[in-house]
Amino acid sequence: VEIKNEKDEFIIAQNDEKQLLVKGYEDLPVGTYEIESLTGELSSLTASREISSDSVNLDDYGLDKPRATAEVTYHDDSKITFELGNDASGDAGCYVRIDKKGPIYVVNSYFAEQLLKESVMYIGTSLITPPEARKDDTSSGTGGNDTAVMKNMKLSGTVRKEPLEFGVNTRTDDSVYSTFNYLITSPLLKGTGDSAANIAQSATSLDAVRAVKAHPTAAQLKEYGLDKPYSVCELTLAVQTFTSTDDDETVTTYYNSTKHIIKLGKKDKDGNYYALVDDYNAVYLLSSGSVPWAETQFNDIVTPLLFLRDITTVKSIEVN
């Protein structure tokens, strides 16, 4: 498929693995759903009615200067050109001409939406997925309860005076820290409150709103505020599993660790962050809800407890 519209011009074709993708974006995730939606429309388009059997009065339908064209080559090597005109009156759809000098039809508005998309809309948006548990994880003795978790997170960026790091509590034998699921390890060793757990639970996967710019230049990164990121998250995920010893003690171990880095820049008008994720050479938009750590500071996640030691009794009280 070769598409030309008011904003972009690009080709969607099969790669060596017979997967459809935008030419030039071979190094980026593939927006499979969007591509299938486009090709589905192009392979089985149904018109609501025919307006004209010949190509006369094209300017009445906006087809003298089409908003978009799609040149499609099918598996049998046959070719068809679709030209998109104006929206039809009465919200009935849009005008489309099939091949030069061919008939003019009214088709659904969804078809117009597909042809007017920019190439970046066909870049995949699933950026981080949870590490997979072993298929035979029942062998751990947990009954198949191996779970993907956030193991460690380091936060930096211009929004913070110094890095903030926290992760899964590995000091459970220490009575001072044994009650915490997560511990702050930098800049101080402290227990965490509920907000740390909420951040950790949301960190095992990440989906973007959409891609904004493929293969950005240094100047474009600066435009999005990504030359000096506002907030940076260095993230380690892993599958957590529990095993029992001969003494009936539970031992926690981890496997299939994956590391990720997310850099946030400026916000768009809707409050989404421009972002770089891992080694993907593209700028994405991330909703603020998908990155709850974006502005998190030490005081936001530290435990509100004044005393970390497990004080269970009071020896005496003196009041003057």
Q: What are the roles of these predicted feature ranges?
A:
Residues V1-N320:
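Soluble, acidic/polar mature domains that operate outside membranes
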